[in-house]
């Protein structure tokens, strides 16, 4: 059989599966009149580690604080913060993690994994059908968006789907494959086709909202930018609290330090979209400088697939006045480590150019200024010489370190800007911007299409 015959057959089978399931599971999911005064219920879904999905945890917390029942769905892994675990209105549903325990070939395992994920997600959402809202993180796009569309069409038609766009899934795939690769093209089509039909689209930057209109033809009236903001547990530390942190972690992170040391902190997932060579080369320039500079203690938090490569490069550097420590921290300890630092560093290089690094938001929440690798959307968060410095390459980063730590006035200036950022919290932003979408509070701002120039002449009827 010709290759295109196989392709057509697979497409027909894929489209037939939801129809068959619909016929087998169809029920009237409308609320009876006796239920209309009950609490509203929202499903918060992320096909990822819940404990490492802070923005979705913040959504769940905000919804519960506003009186919604929340079904929080995702992988078991890192421990979420206590206000999630101890909230009677939040029920956690763990999605089983699919591992390649049989050592199958990559392609074979990938196909079987996606099929299994379809079944797990459909089964979970069928059990939770009838919710008022379904709030979904994207990416990952496949198979999440297709399953969510099926759920909304066939299992729970009354549910309003809200997609929270953190990035574009197809651009992440394009880090590994050429943009012209058939898989990247399919991923882009899939993301636009299934993702474009939501009730509302949240996105992390204004620039991303504009790209969603241009790339996927979405209506600007349904796009609401929601910048990440620091949650309640990220806050500036007093001098006594900083001393407590230095004492509590003296044996592991702050050993052999003097009062002259300056502390830099960075968080990384050790993945290709974060080039840690920029930081290491910048630190090498700082170390080689003939200027009278203070010694540095650099704390790198996080874990990921490229961590062994990073540690090997650190070992080769043999720096004299720069020492590097790595750590994987508990949720409660991470804000404390940030708050004790003099400067934060972000190595995030966006695959799309449209998202923003959550780590910078966390650092601002703790009142520490940030040096960040520059890209298109970064200016929506980092304002050079106001709350941080945007740099291109290791030379600019190294020179920035030297400038800030040899001129206290410059560091103090951006420190003041970071402290101002710490006052603009997630709770304040969420209630004003997102709350009304979930029937919480009242609109207090302009329509998104007017405020951000997202106006569109396209019809919303098919959304």
Swiss-Prot record:
The chain crosses the membrane at residues 4-24. It is a single-pass membrane protein. Residues 106-126 dip into the membrane without crossing it. Residues 1-3, 127-463 are lumenal. GO terms for molecular function: chitobiosyldiphosphodolichol beta-mannosyltransferase activity; mannosyltransferase activity. GO terms for cellular component: cytoplasmic side of endoplasmic reticulum membrane; endoplasmic reticulum. Keywords: Endoplasmic reticulum, Glycosyltransferase, Membrane, Transferase, Transmembrane, Transmembrane helix. It catalyses: an N,N'-diacetylchitobiosyl-diphospho-di-trans,poly-cis-dolichol + GDP-alpha-D-mannose = a beta-D-Man-(1->4)-beta-D-GlcNAc-(1->4)-alpha-D-GlcNAc-diphospho-di-trans,poly-cis-dolichol + GDP + H(+). Residues 25-105 are cytoplasmic. Belongs to the glycosyltransferase group 1 family. This is Chitobiosyldiphosphodolichol beta-mannosyltransferase. The lineage of its organism: Eukaryota, Fungi, Dikarya, Ascomycota, Saccharomycotina. The gene is ALG1.
